[in-house]
Amino acid sequence: MKKEFSRVLLKNQSDEILILKDRPDTWNFPGGKQELGESALECAIREMKEELAVEITELEEIFTGPLVFDSIVWQGHFYFAKQAQGKVTLNEPNKIKGVQFIMRFEEVNFSPGLAPLFDYLARSDYLKLNKTNWK
């Protein structure tokens, strides 16, 4: 069975990007593993609601590709949420140790496995040109 996950990038009103701490020494974007029979898009929507009580709509897939974590190849799907509703709330404190908004990715430590995503984002103006509208 193919290992797949979905992650979501979204911004607050100050153009900062939401990240969470789900590993002891690295930060990540909200999301998680796909469940059986679930699409990558459905996974992204479900994980945001489960983890952080935020409902997202108008998602655009901005990056997809194989990523390697601990010698395991995963198919990663990264979405940008153009619409969000709710207050960011830590729903799974046993799994997620922190949440914050950042201006630059260099501010925190991400997994080296995300390098292909960051390479893409460095070459793209996508995050500069798009915003998340909060209700």
Language-model regions: role of each:
Residues 125-135:
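Acidic/histidine-enriched, glycine/proline-rich intrinsically disordered or flexible terminal extensions
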Residues 80, 90-123:
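NUDIX/MutT-family hydrolases
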Residues 16-17, 85-89:
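Short helix-loop capping/hinge motifs at secondary-structure junctions, enriched
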